Amino acid sequence: MDVSIIGASGKIGSVLSLLLAKESHIKNINLIARSSSINKLKGLKMDLYDAMAAAGQDTDIDICCDDDLSCTANSDITIITAGMARTGEMSRIDLMKGNAKIVKNYVKNIANFGDTKIFMISNPVDLMTYKALIESGYEKNQVFGLGTHLDSMRFKVAVAKHFEVHLDDVRTRIVGEHGDSMVPVISATAVGGIPIKRLPKYEDFPYEKILERIKGYGQEIINLKNGSEYGPASAIVNIVRCIAHDEKRLLTLSTYIEDEIEGIEGGCCIGVPVKVGKNGIEEVIHIKMEDDEIEGFKKSFELVKGYCRQIESI
């Protein structure tokens, strides 16, 4: 598999490069950044080969450094991590407008060179996924974002801790915006196949407290260590592996939907359960939700859709 990383000189891009280099199915990695960061990419390339050698790994993988997007022409997946990082005083609107311009520039050039899958990491991820979709002209299954995947993992950890069970026994997901309007699907949350509402400890489950913590989790990491890279990079590698091996896994990613869920109108990219395989997003999964969950999702959808309309002309 051939993978390109746009923004490879950044925190997520650097960690992602190492994790991908350790994957046996990855045969070529294109490290892409602005021309001012080329020397950093060259140093990263040298460091990656050292890391592989130190781990006793074959170093037959090709690692290329470039500021030219033409190297994405043969990529199976192009991962976009580039963009402005949100600072404490920056508004969501400022971040949205700034990154929309960056994403537009990259995606239009990528589309000129070939047919790839675009995996969006840059925030606000739902909006940047939508911007990448409309600017690329690609099919909607080819463009997707990290969405609420990490939020779902964080909620999964909280459920496992509360019910004192192994993480693998928990099935849950958060849908909607990767942001304050996200919606945990409690009705589809189970431990060992048993809905958590049927478990004795559910009465003490601090749902609201956990949800508020998850909503602010990313910002808390930014405040403590100026950003997260290990969690997102690890999640990205797992999703790339799903595509490489055609695993058909059900994950919660940001993808374009219009009428797949009852009660929504118009289209935008938002976090929903999807089947992930060799073609990217192979199916949007229609899960049944309780009335309050459906209403929460509709509100989240309308919020994201409104922002999507704002960035169409940027």
UniProtKB/Swiss-Prot annotation:
Catalyzes the reversible oxidation of malate to oxaloacetate. Substrate binds at residues 86, 92, 123, 154. Transmembrane segments: none annotated. GO terms for molecular function: L-lactate dehydrogenase activity; L-malate dehydrogenase (NAD+) activity; L-malate dehydrogenase (NADP+) activity. GO terms for biological process: lactate metabolic process; tricarboxylic acid cycle. Its EC number is 1.1.1.299. Belongs to the LDH/MDH superfamily. It holds the Pfam family Ldh_1_N. Keywords: NAD, NADP, Oxidoreductase, Tricarboxylic acid cycle. NADP(+) binds at residues 7-13, 99, 121-123. The gene is mdh. The keyword Glycoprotein does not apply. It catalyses: (S)-malate + NADP(+) = oxaloacetate + NADPH + H(+); (S)-malate + NAD(+) = oxaloacetate + NADH + H(+). The active site is at 178 (proton acceptor). This is Malate dehydrogenase. InterPro entries: L-lactate/malate_DH, L-lactate_DH_AS, Lactate/malate_DH_C, Lactate/malate_DH_N, Lactate_DH/Glyco_Ohase_4_C, NAD(P)-bd_dom_sf.
